[in-house]
Each structure stands twice: as structure tokens, then as C-alpha cells.
Design a protein with these regions (language model features):
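C-terminal motif of bacterial Sec signal peptides marking the signal peptidase cleavage site
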Residues: 16-18
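Bacterial signal peptide processing site
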Residues: 20-22
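Catalytic-core environment of secreted peptidases
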Residues: 44-93, 109, 115-117, 246-319, ...
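Soluble metallo-hydrolase cores and metallopeptidase-like ectodomains found primarily
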Residues: 121-149, 192-288, 301-304, 308, ...
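Metal-dependent peptidase/peptidase-like ectodomains
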Residues: 121-124, 212, 220, 311, ...
Length: 454
């Protein structure tokens, strides 16, 4: 870490250690919220580069080991954010009068390598096949060899042709040929048992997803030689699995009595991809500086500015969600068990990857996904936000972040971003050194007054 930033990061670590002593992964309550700060001069509400840099450097540091979904490192990030919310005088909206919200997760884990039988041929996970995702088990069906451009009917066992685009959304089991990418991770994936993804416990159980299996080259050739309609069975012995993820949630009550009952949610996901096992000479930590420490810091910066200056007209809930990278579990729980009634939420604004300017747009510009779906983007832009419509609607960014959880429940919900297609995305290269702090600070600052006036 550069020496000039060491002092600020050490100070943040001290703040975290103090908060961690008061808050546990089991959701113990922190102490009482700080008193409401007195109104300050206008310049105290500015978003400073020093603020943005210091918080992002900590959240994306090696000390948090990539903030892996549902890990102790994710909990540390949530606890750290909670300590800041407390300091700024936000109202706690988490468990037991605190700011941290624990979300218990439940799933299933295979206890032995799953097996696939097609006709008289048997294949085993880790040998002739690799089970990538685990759906319903046991499962039975008949082989259907898809042609290029074809689509599998509901419940089908679909064999995907090499290099062809096909529809597999309704298939129960998908059989694909191994790829170079799969071959590179074959040994690592074979060494652990497949699992059904953890999901928030207590919510309506989802329909089991597809089982996706990659067949090694000889096995794929053997299955391809079989006739359509050949009987298929898939077996896996499953045991319950459990885990947890953590949100950090605080509230700032609006200043206008006529509008304070309406709630604006400002959100981001605090988790990332964690770390791979250590390897000599290799960077194995996915720091997630842009994805999504940048969005998390944007929410923190807005919380700080709005809490220290004039209150916003409407009540604002600041929500940092866990396990977005593992399926959006923190947001799913929040929407299912909201801290304020859903029908009082006028909009959710998710912040995702604000750390680099978009080469297609002017500097310091942000864009809003699904711009045409509501008047929110136009309203914010008219009030001074550096905000335009998503220039790449073909990428379907509207459905690719936690805002979609709100949208599916009828809440106006969008994501604000600045660029998400850079080469460091979801790699260990997503480091603080690549963040454009001047761009990020100016872009966030342009949102303070528009949000305050909403």
C-alpha cells in the first residue's frame, strides 16, 4: 500500500476494531445511536476525495480478503459500515436496535460424487463429468439432442451442440461439452462436492434450478452417439447446508412532514468474490475496488453528506447488501422483510461500479439503467445530477444488480453506474490503483442536492 495512504487506513482499522468489539456475527446490538448532529455550514456537506479514497482503500484492501459473500470478511465490511452510520447519527434499522442485519441462509450439499446414467453408460462427478450447478435430485428424463437454435421443452435433459446457441431456460438437466475454461478449473471443482446455492431461509422456497453438467471430450462423444429418447437418470445424496450473510442498514428521517413518510432507498452491495487459495507469486485476492466498493462508498458518502447538512425532504434508507455476487440474498431478504413498508418506498437507487469514467460519455458522467421505465433519471438530471441514460441497453444491466429485487415487487428501481465493462471486472486486478477518484468524487457530489430535494 502506498505510504501516503497508510495513516488513513490504519485509522479506519482502529474504528473497525472498536465497532467489532460491540457487534458480533450473531447480530448483537451496537450501543445507542449518536445524537443528531447540529446543522453545519454548506461546505461540510461536500463529498471530498479524501473521504471517498479513505473508505474505498479500506473496503478494497487485502485486509478484507475480497469481502467474499457470506464470509467473516463480508461481516467485517458490514460491521465497519455500521460503525460509520453510528458516528454520523443515522437511525439503526438492523437487528436488535443495531445497524447490522443478519440473513440466515439454507441450501444443500452433495455428500458423495453425483452420478449420471444415460442408457447403460454411467458418469461420475470429477471423472467423466463436472457438475457445475445442482438442481433437483434425483431426476429422470429422456435425452434430447438440441439442434443449433433449438430450445429445450420444460423438464428436458438437453444435450447442447458444440459452439451453438440454444434455449435451455426450461431444461431440467443440461449437458454441455467441456471448454478450455472448464478444463482449467476441472481439478479444483472436482475436489469439492457440488452444492445447491444457499438462499435466505424462511422465504418461499424457489423451484430447483437446472442441473448443469460439463462432459469431458470422450464422454460427450459417447452421449452424442446415443439416440434421442434414451433414458437418463441423475442421482445425488444431499445433506442440508447453512450459512449467513449480512446487510448494513441506517435511516435518515426526512425534513418535510408531508413527505417524510415516503422513503427513498439508496443501496449497493458490500460483498465481492473473496479470494482463491494462496499461490506463490500470484495475486489471489479479488479486492473488488470498483465492484462494488465504489458503489458502497457512494452510498456512504451520500449518507454522510445528507446527515451532516440540511435534511432531505423525504426519508432516506441507506442499505448495503450482502451476497449480491452469490445470488442477491441480502437484497432478497430486505425486500421480503422490509424495514419500512414496500408501498412507502418511492424508489430504490442501486450504485454499482462508479470508479471509472465511461469512454462513451463526458467525464464525471453517470448513467441510469432502465432510464425509460420511470421519470427518476430525468428528475435527478433536471435537479443537477450528472446523469444520462444507460448507453448500452443491450447489456441488460437493469436486471444485473440488486435493484431488480425491488423492481419485481413493483417498486421503481434503477442502478446508477459509470462503467462496468473494463478488463479488471471480476479479476484480481480490480484494485484501488485503477480507481479514478476525481471522476468518482465529482460524480457522487452531483447527486447530493438532487437527492436532498426529491
Amino acid at each position: 500500500m502506498p505510504a501516503r495512504h497508510l495513516a488513513s487506513t490504519l485509522a479506519l482499522l482502529v474504528a473497525l476494531s472498536g465497532c467489532a468489539a460491540r457487534t458480533t456475527p450473531a447480530g448483537a446490538a451496537p450501543g445507542p445511536a449518536a445524537a443528531e448532529p447540529a446543522p453545519q455550514a454548506a461546505n461540510a456537506t461536500e463529498v471530498s476525495e479524501a473521504f471517498v479514497r479513505a473508505h474505498l482503500e479500506f473496503l478494497a484492501s487485502d485486509a478484507l480478503n475480497g469481502r467474499g459473500s457470506g464470509t467473516r470478511d463480508e461481516w467485517l465490511a458490514a460491521t465497519y459500515i455500521a460503525s460509520q452510520f453510528r458516528e454520523w447519527g443515522l437511525e439503526p434499522m438492523g437487528d436488535d436496535g443495531g445497524y447490522v442485519q443478519r440473513v440466515d441462509l439454507a441450501g444443500a450439499q452433495a455428500t458423495a460424487p453425483p452420478t449420471l446414467t444415460i442408457g447403460d453408460r454411467a458418469f461420475t462427478h470429477g471423472r467423466e463429468m463436472l457438475v457445475l450447478t445442482l438442481g433437483a435430485a434425483p431426476a429422470r428424463g429422456r435425452l434430447l439432442k438440441l439442434a443449433a437454435g433449438g430450445a429445450a421443452p420444460p423438464g428436458a435433459v438437453a444435450l447442447v451442440p458444440e459452439g451453438a446457441k440454444v434455449g435451455i431456460a426450461d431444461a431440467a438437466i443440461v449437458l454441455e461439452p467441456e471448454t478450455p475454461q472448464v478444463r482449467r478449473v476441472w481439478a479444483a471443482r472436482a475436489a469439492r462436492m457440488p452444492s445447491r446455492p444457499l438462499r435466505p431461509s424462511g422465504l418461499a422456497p424457489p423451484v430447483p434450478g437446472r442441473t448443469v453438467i460439463f462432459l469431458e471430450t470422450a464422454a460427450y462423444a459417447a452421449v452424442s452417439a446415443l439416440a434421442d429418447g434414451t433414458e437418463v437418470s441423475f442421482a445425488a445424496d444431499l445433506a442440508p447446508a447453512a450459512g449467513a450473510t449480512w446487510n448494513a442498514v441506517g435511516r435518515l428521517t426526512g425534513s418535510n412532514p408531508a413527505a417524510a413518510g415516503d422513503v427513498l432507498v439508496l443501496s449497493a452491495h458490500l460483498d465481492h468474490l473473496g479470494a482463491r487459495p494462496p499461490s506463490p507469486g500470484a495475486d489471489t485476492i479479488f479486492n473488488g475496488a470498483d465492484d462494488d466498493a465504489s458503489g458502497t462508498v457512494a452510498v456512504m458518502a451520500l449518507a454522510h453528506a445528507l446527515a451532516q447538512g440540511p435534511r432531505p425532504r423525504r426519508t432516506v434508507v441507506f442499505a448495503l447488501f450482502g451476497s449480491e455476487e452469490a445470488g442477491g440474498h441480502g437484497a432478497a431478504y430486505f425486500v421480503d422483510r422490509p424495514v419500512v413498508p414496500l408501498d412507502r418506498i418511492v424508489a430504490d437507487v442501486q450504485f454499482e461500479m462508479l470508479g471509472r469514467p465511461d469512454p462513451m460519455l463526458p467525464e464525471d458522467t453517470l448513467w441510469l439503467t432502465g432510464y425509460e421505465r420511470s421519470t427518476l433519471g430525468a428528475d435527478l438530471a433536471a435537479a443537477g445530477a450528472n446523469l444520462v441514460a444507460d448507453p448500452r441497453p443491450d447489456q441488460s444491466f437493469f436486471t444485473r444488480s440488486d435493484n431488480i429485487r425491488f423492481a419485481r415487487r413493483g417498486v421503481v428501481a434503477h442502478t446508477i453506474s459509470s462503467f462496468g465493462l473494463h478488463e479488471a471486472y471480476h479479476t484480481p486486478d480490480d484494485e484501488v490503483a485503477l480507481i479514478d477518484f476525481d471522476h468518482m468524487t465529482r460524480a457522487i457530489a452531483s447527486l447530493v442536492a438532487p437527492i436532498r430535494s426529491m
